[in-house]
């Protein structure tokens, strides 16, 4: 995948629709994850969740109330290629901002924050990252958790690849791995689903931000997304989505600071 991305980058490819076309056609294609409750998941034939609601609100700000939002389901490894070949105009897909990804796409202001954490069975006695030596650990290609394991070979972690959260959970339940490394805001879902699991390492690596993304150098669309996010923050939309979706789902398992970045937006609007 990295080789393909490099070729596209060198060619200067940018297939995402520009802002003028989106506003003229009143259609915007937005990539969302297919299995990441409470952010985005396909249920009963349609997408729902925090990022889905946010994406639709942003689309209305950019185009108007009569916008047609085409939601495109993506897995982690799809996100950059879909933006580069025009299958999506914008990603609201739990996409962590990283220097590597910034070579190929442009990120908006963040709307969530997170940190890597580790899930294991209760009693597994994993107290520090070095305890993962020779442990089979589930990671999803295309994510920052996958990158973390690959960039720390000295830890001796035996990575087991899985396609998405649902696939990872099944493999864990089937005994194919000892642990699962992913962002804390997604790992909390596992402990809600299975009381035999625990967050054995709540912080692995550095704190991260999650943002929307557009194709590289699609500057007008990026500005429109940022303007929409600022406007929605000032109107209290983030607070509403937090109270309606995230707060009742997590029930205090994730600190509010990860899920609500109004302080960031308030500081930028001064």
Q: Model regions: which residues?
A:
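A ligand-binding cleft/hinge motif common to bilobed small-molecule-binding domains
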Residues: 78, 94-103, 148-151, 171-206
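Periplasmic-binding protein-like
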Residues: 34, 112-120, 188-230, 248-270
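Bilobed "Venus flytrap"/periplasmic-binding protein-like clamshell domains
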Residues: 34-38, 47-62, 117-165, 184-185
